[in-house]
Structures are given as C-alpha cells and as structure tokens.
C-alpha cells in the first residue's frame, strides 16, 4: 500500500483552507478526505491523522493546523480551484451572488491571483456595488459578467485533484481570450454611445 507525502497535497490543503475560512466548505469535507487517505495508506502521515480527528475542532483551529503545512502563502492554483467551486455551487443555486462577489474580493487580497485576474475581480466587485446601490448598471448584468469569468475555472473540481495541474495550464490563455472579448465589447459600446467610459485606475488592462 502507498504512503502519502502530505507535501504533495499543498494545493489541495490550500483550497481546503480558503474554503473553510470563507464558509464555502464544511470541516467534514476535510475529515472525509483525510479518512480516505488513511484507508489507502499503509502508514498514514501524522498530519493526515490529525485532520481526520479534527471534526470536533473549530474552523479557526483547523485553519491554523492547515497553515502549519501550507506556510505563509497559499498556492495560486488553490484560489483558482475555489473559483471553479464557486462556479459549480452558484449555477447549482447553492450560493447567492453576493457571496460569490465577496469571495472574489477576498481572493484579490489573499489568493495570489494574477494581475489580470485581479482586474476582472475588481471590476465585478465595483459593478456589483454600483448596481446594488442603484447608481449604475443592473444586478442581472453583473451576474452575467461574473458567471462568464468564473466559468473559466469550471474544469476544477475537488474530486479531480490529479487533473489540476493540467487544467491550470489552460487558465492564463482563457483569461487572455476573455480580456480580448471584453475590450472589443467596450469598444463597440463606446462607438455606439459616443461616450467615454470612466475606468478605475486599478483596471490596468481595460484602458489599453
């Protein structure tokens, strides 16, 4: 029987960490994963045993435990998997749009996202606030834009960990393609309205 090297699962643990911290995952999902590893291993890693027994612990205690292995920075791919999880749970009507947007903003701050990803997320957060306050745009339009963005990550699932690296290699190009589409849409909108769209300073590529 194999013996799991917990260091090979840093990306997965990072995803668990983000999901727990933001209420997207339940601690029993982590316990279930650890139990599965224990059953398949001849000599389970002590850390996996700790996770298996953490069902009675608080979320904060489990997050602290995970951080002992993950370290100071959560891997970028962990945040991208969370985006995939957001997509599936939103389309399955398990999450409200506000929860999705709130988690996007959290990922801007702590998710090790690329600058292009942050630009999309900043825009969605700002558009949502403006729509909710009845200042500009509609919630329906924000929902459509949000879904179009997080759909890029839909091939990430908790149960296809062995495919994460392969899926991750496709993400940057998908983001580039979406960026091009949005730029073309903005140009058409400007030409159609004859007006200049005000852009936030942090939306770096929108003005290019």
Language model regions located:
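Acidic, Ser/Pro/Thr-rich low-complexity regulatory regions
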Residues: 1-208
